[in-house]
């Protein structure tokens, strides 16, 4: 049908639509041609984009709302179906684990190990996996039942002994529940916990003060009672409050109460830093004792102390060394001393410490020869109840959870009782005592003692009596494991040679690199790295001289002699320094380093301290500490036969941070150091020779290179503070000499061996690393150490041994 026929059929007449108002409207047809659609405007585009953005934002908000609901407001108890499913899963797992443990009890031990903290479970699981990989199921099961299970039982006993009832009560306070997991905490966590403990102590102080703030008339005894309440809270944490012995309540008090100590004591108990030091020390000790309980401190694992403590000590040394290198000491006159050089020149240097003790022992030997005394070498060991691990690395069944500190206290108490009985019997001796650890960290003593020949048998018998009187039944007829004595035969060696090895291996292992320890199987030089953290962690005094004058006065006399030599200048060498000839003779002996003469001039051995001619003088420090009290520092020396005191520390030094070196701050020697990676400053213009030769005040600089020693000495002492500071700044800007290119020559076989050793240590063994080592460089190996190639073998950097 055509279009016209359709119009006729529908009665449509074009003549009837002569006007626009009666013309038919166009029908709405979605299938129109795209060209006939109205064009899209800018406003319609904006509306469309806005609607799309709103839709995306709405979807994002709905997703976030679902996440927030699931995380904070959704609980399984609100969904019974899911809750029932989760409960069924847990019940089925528990039944399966129970069935497995019923048929295989070893699964219970493995589950208990995995439930321990990481510092316990990780090393134990490594050993368990090793035994499992051997393919010997009986040996594997026996190891779990005979070694791991007793270790876990001992660990629980150690934890119970560490967490006392009062300590648990303190942990019940709000925010202090972290005290229950103190050994598992890191340093940051201990810092946060110490802040909470300090806040708790502050609240206790506010509650204890009561109405004291409202009254002006407060008696000192009322303040002391307030201090007692805060100190009682501190004692609940197994921490002794500061000045506790002087301020605590006593029935028969001979001296008046020092009320001036209360402010400093309270300031410390309210300080977060003070609590951090106490809690961190407690954390390290508790953690170490837990590792001893599971046999991780022994000759089979880590001798003397845990590997974690050794790594912590290495990092502490590295930080201390960086601190010393970045600071210097400055006095009022502007003189500066490098702090690293000062530390190395003091007794903190292991070499100086070892030399001083060896000189002292040699002096005792010479005095003994002069007096006709004999020398005896003793070894005293604690009973078996103090030893946590056997020599084969298995737990000791007789161990009573005794700590390393308790073993040291046992020996100290035993020695005090013996000394009292010896003096009561009229016997005397003098010598040196060395404390060192067994492979499990338990303390034992070596003593080199000098005595009269007629008293040797009596002293030895009395010492043996006190050394074996506890747990005597475990020794039987053989007392060797607890007590040994050996009369030193001059034909075999001198007393100094007997004790030299024990002194060296407990300091830095000097000269003992080739000797192997019978107890640990390692070099004695390497053992020194483990002994120092052991003594520091457990607060064990390693060396002790007795029966001789104090060595601090000896050090002060040597310091005074050096100061006098610099001040005398042109005076004849050996001129008297002190007016009193007796005192000057003691100073001369100390300056010469002869301990024998020094001891005899002081009065000799076995002389009470009140009869020594020269003693160390102390004074109250003028500058207060951070807690408001004034400490005590060494002033110099004094003598009861001379008036006044002699000051050896007249110059006061302050520790300041070193100035930044311009050459290190900006590589281009520009006007200032860049604060970004690149420096956009222009290069510094070269100064002319006249500006270089002028000082800061415009005066020409003096040429010190052409002066002789006397002129240079006079010129340096006549300089002002400003000129000294300028000279020090000029010396810092001196460019260091660059080393020439250096490269070791090795064969192809040695190169392959070097690559293999690098790969075995975890490195890539690439040509770049090999070339770096051959040119004298080093590669960091972790814990502040570096490896380098020397004498055709890889070595580990141990430069810290020469500094600490």
From Swiss-Prot:
Q: Name one Pfam family in it.
A: Phage_GPA
A molecular function (GO) held by this record is: endonuclease activity
Q: Which GO terms describe its biological process?
A: DNA replication
Q: Which UniProt keywords apply?
A: DNA replication, Endonuclease, Hydrolase, Nuclease
The keyword Phosphoprotein appears for this protein = no
Q: Where is the active site?
A: 498 (o-(5'-phospho-dna)-tyrosine intermediate), 502 (o-(5'-phospho-dna)-tyrosine intermediate)
Enzyme Commission number(s) from the entry: 3.1.-.-
Top-level class of the enzyme under EC nomenclature: hydrolase
The UniProt similarity line reads:
Belongs to the phage GPA family.
Function recorded in the entry = Possible endonuclease which induces a single-strand cut and initiates DNA replication.
| Name of protein | Probable replication endonuclease from prophage-like region
């Amino acid at each position: 049908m055509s279009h016209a026929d359709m119009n006729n059929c529908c009665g449509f007449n074009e003549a009837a639509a002569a006007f626009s108002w009666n013309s038919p409207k166009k029908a709405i047809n979605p299938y129109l041609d795209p060209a006939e659609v109205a064009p899209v405007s800018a406003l319609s585009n904006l509306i469309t984009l806005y609607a799309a953005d709103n839709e995306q934002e709405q979807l994002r908000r709905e997703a976030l709302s679902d996440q927030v609901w699931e995380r904070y407001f959704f609980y399984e108890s609100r969904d019974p179906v899911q809750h029932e499913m989760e409960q069924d899963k847990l019940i089925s797992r528990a039944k399966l684990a129970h069935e497995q443990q019923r048929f295989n009890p070893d699964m219970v031990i493995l589950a208990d190990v995995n439930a321990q903290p990481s510092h316990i479970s990780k090393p134990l699981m490594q050993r368990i996996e090793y035994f499992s990989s051997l393919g010997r199921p009986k040996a594997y099961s026996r190891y779990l039942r005979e070694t791991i299970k007793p270790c876990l039982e001992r660990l629980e006993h150690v934890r119970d002994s560490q967490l006392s009832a009062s300590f648990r009560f303190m942990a019940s306070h709000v925010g202090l529940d972290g005290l229950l997991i103190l050994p598992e905490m890191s340093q940051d966590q201990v810092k946060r916990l110490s802040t909470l403990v300090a806040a708790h102590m502050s609240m206790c102080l506010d509650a204890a003060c009561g109405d004291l703030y409202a009254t002006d008339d407060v008696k000192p005894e009322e303040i002391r009672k307030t201090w007692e309440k805060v100190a009682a809270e501190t004692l609940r944490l197994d921490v002794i409050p500061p000045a506790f012995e002087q301020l605590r309540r006593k029935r028969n008090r001979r001296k008046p109460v020092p009320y001036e100590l209360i402010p400093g004591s309270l300031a410390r108990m309210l300080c977060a830093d003070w609590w951090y030091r106490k809690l961190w020390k407690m954390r390290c000790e508790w953690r170490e004792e837990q590792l001893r309980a599971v046999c991780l401190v022994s000759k089979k694992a880590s001798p003397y102390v845990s590997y974690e403590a050794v790594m912590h000590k290495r990092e502490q040394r590295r930080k201390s060394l960086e601190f010393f290198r970045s600071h210097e000491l400055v006095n009022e006159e502007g003189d500066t001393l490098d702090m690293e050089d000062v530390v190395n020149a003091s007794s903190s240097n292991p070499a100086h410490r070892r030399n001083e003790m060896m000189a002292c022992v040699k002096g005792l030997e010479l005095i003994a020869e002069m007096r006709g005394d004999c020398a005896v070498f003793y070894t005293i060991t604690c009973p078996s109840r103090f030893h946590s691990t056997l020599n084969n690395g298995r737990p000791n069944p007789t161990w009573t959870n005794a700590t390393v500190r308790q073993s040291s206290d046992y020996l100290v108490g035993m020695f005090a009782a013996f000394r009292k009985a010896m003096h009561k019997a009229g016997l005397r001796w003098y010598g040196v005592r060395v404390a060192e650890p067994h492979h499990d960290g338990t303390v034992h003593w070596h003593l080199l003692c000098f005595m009269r020949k007629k008293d040797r048998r009596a002293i030895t018998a009395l010492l043996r009596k006190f050394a074996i009187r506890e747990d005597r039944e475990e020794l039987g007829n053989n007392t060797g494991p607890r007590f040994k004595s050996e009369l030193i035969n001059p034909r075999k060696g001198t007393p100094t040679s007997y004790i030299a090895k024990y002194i060296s291996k407990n300091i830095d292992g000097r000269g003992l690199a080739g000797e192997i320890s019978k107890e640990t199987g390692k070099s004695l030089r390497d053992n020194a790295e483990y002994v120092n953290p052991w003594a520091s962690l457990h607060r064990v005094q390693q060396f002790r001289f007795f029966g001789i004058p104090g060595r601090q006065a000896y050090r002060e006399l040597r310091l005074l002699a050096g100061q006098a030599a610099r001040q005398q200048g042109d005076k004849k060498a050996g001129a008297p320094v002190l007016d009193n000839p007796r005192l000057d003779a003691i100073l001369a002996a100390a300056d010469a380093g002869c301990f024998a003469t020094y001891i005899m001039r002081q009065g000799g051995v076995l002389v009470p301290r009140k009869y020594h001619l020269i003693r160390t003088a102390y004074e109250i420090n003028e500058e207060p500490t951070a807690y408001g009290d004034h400490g005590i520092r060494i002033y110099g020396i004094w003598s009861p036969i001379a008036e006044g005191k002699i000051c050896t520390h007249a110059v006061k030094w302050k520790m300041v941070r070193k100035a930044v070196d311009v050459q290190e701050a900006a590589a281009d020697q520009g006007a200032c150091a860049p604060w970004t990676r690149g420096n956009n400053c222009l290069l510094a213009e070269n100064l002319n020779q006249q500006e270089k030769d002028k000082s800061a005040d415009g005066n020409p600089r003096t040429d010190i290179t052409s002066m002789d020693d006397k002129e240079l000495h006079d010129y340096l002492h006549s300089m002002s503070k400003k000129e000294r500071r300028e000279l020090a700044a000029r010396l810092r800007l001196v460019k260091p000499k660059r080393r020439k290119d250096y490269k070791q020559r090795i064969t192809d076989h040695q190169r392959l061996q070097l690559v293999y050793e690098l790969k075995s240590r975890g490195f890539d063994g690439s040509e770049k690393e090999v070339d770096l080592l051959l040119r004298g460089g080093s590669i960091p190996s972790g814990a502040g150490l570096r490896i380098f190639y020397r004498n055709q073998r890889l070595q580990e950097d141990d430069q810290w041994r020469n500094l600490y």
